[in-house]
């Protein structure tokens, strides 16, 4: 412990000296003159020199303090997972700062906060992405107030070597408008943005109401852009909806009653106002009116709110009234920035495997049936398409897969996963990766190699890890080329049955193109209760949900076997699981008459939604 402390102190002093060295070198000549009695301006140069040193040391100290503070928080790396991070204010003041990560590796930022929040923002971003120099794909600025835009301005102008970004999205009204109204803060922030953005005009994207576009897996719908007839700068906040995974999120900036009512008038009939998550307008007080929140009807509210606003310490705010509204509206969870930075996982999509249908089923018709039943995603079982005459085995497998994606698009459903036949060294891996991309799925689940060349079960952990790591690494370039993530699942034999070893395999491979899928039924068959996940070095990126009585791999509906489902959902809550609910309970449906299949699947999906509610 003493040795570690000494190393830390040496590191701090080395960093301090490195930061101070340029200033010392630049000041060498004035300092020399001072030492021989230079008179004119010597005193002021001396003061300037030491002020510069003090400022650099203070800045470096703040960065070091922030670095260790973020490490102490144990910020969750959610790169390539769907999640929202709401950042706390380091000064317990009003500010909006959100980082969103997507399952396809995109990073989105909404606002950022005051200049003083910049060090924390950057360190937090590094922790979230696992990148020394994080890259932001899209940075939204809601409106020109300092507590929303200063982190962007500071980062773009003075910290460009620490963070990169592709584009900044906003709709600021002209400087002249704010000047004519003597709105000082609007004038100042617009002026600063205009000055700084001259260095990157090609990165500026203007948002308008009605814009719809995607940033990777996130779909953005702009519902409101500034109406200059509204006087308050807060009313010039862009309001937009984000759909990500199975969750819809309403971002409101500091919008107030006029902006909220205009948005309702133009969009309420479309159903797009109704969202799972709502960012509270204007920090949760004096924002939009109750009717707006009623239309949003959120399950979760995000409060970028300091303690003194939450408690209405000064007695002149509407926070207590708004809090009462949200309680009356039945909000299930309130995340509050003053309680610390928070990670909000997207609502897991309810997905079912196509293995609920018999081998050789009509894949296109199955898409329509699953969409009509309210399924939110499809897991395409390529393992059920290995037979003579199968389109998956034909030369036309890619056009076939592309036709299924087109069918899913028209039905309003997505393929989220696929399942490869055999193990990771099978002859079908290449076409499985290509077909997974062709149907538009992100994840390809594949079994690990569990037998050696002689057909013997591999029981030695180290041997299992080496054989599978070598096999997986062979396919990573192909997965990268096609935008697919390979997921190994725990199966039933030898080392492959231990979820902890599968998680260790992910660490050994060390690629963002490889993760793992926890099959709760397989684990139960092999003597592992669901809480084994708490012993795994890496959290799973997906789940296979099915039940059994531990005597065999029965793929029953949850509740028809002996798995402890309360333990399962409680463990997922505890580890902060962020993936989908993939139902692999296909036994009952697979062997039922087709006329009974829809009723069976409806019941299965209802069970899945109940589990999802418990997971959150």
Where are these regions (language model features)?
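Active-site acidic/histidine proton-transfer and metal-coordination neighborhood
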Residues: 371, 402, 414, 421-518, ...
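Histidine-acidic metal/acid-base catalytic patches
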Residues: 348-351, 360-374, 437-440, 499-518, ...
């Amino acid at each position: 412990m003493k040795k570690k402390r000494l190393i830390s102190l040496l590191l701090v002093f080395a960093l301090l000296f490195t930061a101070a060295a340029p200033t010392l070198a630049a000041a060498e000549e004035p300092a020399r003159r001072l030492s021989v009695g230079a008179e004119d301006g010597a005193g002021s140069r001396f003061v300037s020199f030491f002020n510069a040193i003090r400022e650099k040391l203070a800045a470096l100290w703040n960065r070091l303090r922030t670095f260790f503070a973020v490490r102490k928080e144990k910020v969750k790396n959610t790169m390539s997972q769907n999640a929202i991070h709401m950042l706390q204010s380091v000064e317990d003041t009003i500010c909006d700062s959100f980082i969103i990560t997507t399952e396809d590796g995109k990073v989105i930022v909404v606002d950022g906060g005051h200049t003083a929040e910049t060090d924390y923002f950057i360190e937090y971003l590094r922790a979230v992405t696992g990148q020394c120099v994080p890259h932001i794909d899209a940075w939204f600025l809601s409106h020109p107030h300092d507590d929303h835009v200063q982190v962007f301005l500071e980062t773009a102008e003075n910290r460009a070597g620490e963070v990169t970004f592709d584009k900044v999205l906003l709709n600021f009204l002209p400087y002249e408008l704010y000047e004519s109204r003597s709105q000082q803060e609007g004038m100042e922030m617009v002026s600063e943005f205009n000055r700084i953005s001259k260095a990157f005009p090609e990165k500026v994207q203007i948002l308008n109401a009605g814009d719809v576009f995607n940033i990777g897996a996130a779909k953005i719908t702009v519902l409101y852009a500034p109406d200059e007839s509204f006087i308050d700068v807060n009313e010039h906040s862009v309001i937009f909806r984000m759909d990500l995974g199975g969750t819809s999120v309403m971002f409101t900036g500091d919008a107030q009653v006029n902006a909220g009512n205009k948005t309702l008038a133009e969009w309420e009939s479309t159903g797009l106002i109704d969202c799972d998550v709502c960012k509270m307008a204007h920090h949760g007080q004096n924002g939009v009116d109750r009717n707006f929140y009623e239309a949003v009807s959120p399950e979760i509210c995000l409060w970028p709110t300091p303690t003194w606003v939450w408690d209405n310490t000064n007695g002149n705010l509407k926070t207590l009234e708004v809090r009462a509204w949200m309680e009356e509206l039945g909000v299930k969870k309130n995340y509050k920035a003053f309680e610390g930075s928070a990670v909000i996982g997207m609502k897991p999509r309810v997905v079912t495997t196509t293995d609920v249908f018999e081998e050789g089923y009509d894949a296109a018709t199955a898409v329509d049936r699953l969409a009509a039943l309210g399924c939110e995603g499809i897991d395409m079982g390529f393992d059920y398409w290995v037979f003579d005459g199968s389109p998956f085995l034909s030369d036309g497998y890619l056009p076939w897969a592309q036709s299924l994606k087109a069918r899913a698009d028209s039905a309003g459903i997505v393929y989220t996963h696929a399942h490869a036949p055999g193990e990771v060294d099978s002859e079908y891996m290449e076409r499985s990766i290509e077909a997974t991309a062709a149907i538009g799925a992100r994840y390809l689940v594949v079994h690990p190699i569990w037998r050696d060349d002689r057909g013997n079960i591999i029981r030695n952990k180290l041997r299992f890890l080496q054989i599978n790591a070598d096999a997986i690494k062979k396919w990573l370039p192909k997965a990268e080329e096609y935008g697919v993530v390979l997921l190994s699942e725990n199966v039933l034999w030898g080392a492959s049955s231990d979820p902890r070893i599968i998680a260790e395999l992910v660490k050994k491979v060390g690629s963002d193109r490889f993760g793992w899928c926890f099959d709760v039924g397989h684990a139960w068959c092999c003597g592992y209760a669901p809480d084994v996940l708490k012993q795994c070095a890496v959290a799973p990126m997906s789940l296979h949900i099915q039940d059994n009585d531990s005597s065999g791999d029965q793929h029953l509906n949850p509740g028809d076997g002996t798995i402890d489902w309360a333990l399962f959902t409680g463990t997922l809550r505890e580890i902060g699981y962020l993936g989908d609910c993939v139902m692999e309970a296909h036994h009952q449906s697979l062997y039922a008459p087709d006329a009974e299949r829809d009723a069976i699947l409806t019941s299965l999906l209802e069970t899945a939604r109940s589990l999802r509610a418990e997971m959150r």
